[in-house]
Design a protein with these regions (language model features):
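Conserved RNase H-like, two-metal-ion catalytic cores of nucleic-acid enzymes
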Residues: 2-135, 139
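Acidic, Mg2+-coordinating catalytic module of metal-dependent nucleases/exonucleases
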Residues: 145-166
Length: 166
């Protein structure tokens, strides 16, 4: 590991498109079902721009499956069944940072994590002085996260490429 954290320009697999149609949702569920290991999960909201705490983008990654950027509002309008998603991930451990922020929105959508690992709680238990996601990622992986879109209006459509890269 170098002394200076490395900023990743974009994901190894490239910047993913948003999954906002029923066929794309079903394809992604199939990808997840045939993949393995833990499920990294995150959600983005538009709290500073809209009333409510609903998720406007949910993000997932699992070994053997691509990065999934899912538009829960568009998928709900299309009739997506989150039970298909739940079956696809099974009892995989969901990895979240500050899960108290994201779990209510996941539950509202119908996602049902069976097992959970919270990296913020782990960082606190390990005695890290800085336990935000960027600090934890830098500490353990030597990677710098770009955080310029963390407070963006995630309800905006279509999502710009640099937001999808975030």
């Amino acid at each position: 590991m170098t002394d200076e954290p490395k900023l990743l320009a974009e994901p190894r697999e490239g910047v993913p498109n948003v999954i906002d149609t029923l066929p794309a949702f079903r394809d992604y569920c199939s990808e997840l079902a045939s993949s393995h290991g833990s499920l990294a999960a995150d959600a983005e909201r538009a709290s500073g721009f809209r009333y409510g705490h609903e998720d406007w983008l949910v993000q997932f990654k699992r070994d053997g499956a691509g990065i999934g950027l899912l538009d829960p509002q568009a998928l709900a309008a299309a009739g997506a069944d989150w039970n298909d998603f739940n079956r696809a991930v099974g009892d995989a451990v969901w990895i979240l940072h500050d899960s108290l922020q994201d779990l209510p929105g996941f539950a509202e959508l119908g996602m049902e994590p069976q097992r959970l690992f919270d990296t913020e709680i782990a960082a606190r238990l390990l005695g890290l002085k800085r336990f935000g996601l960027a600090a934890v990622t830098e500490h353990f992986l030597g990677l710098t996260l770009a955080k310029e879109h963390s407070a963006a209006d995630w309800s905006y459509r279509p999502l710009p490429r640099d937001w999808r890269n975030y």
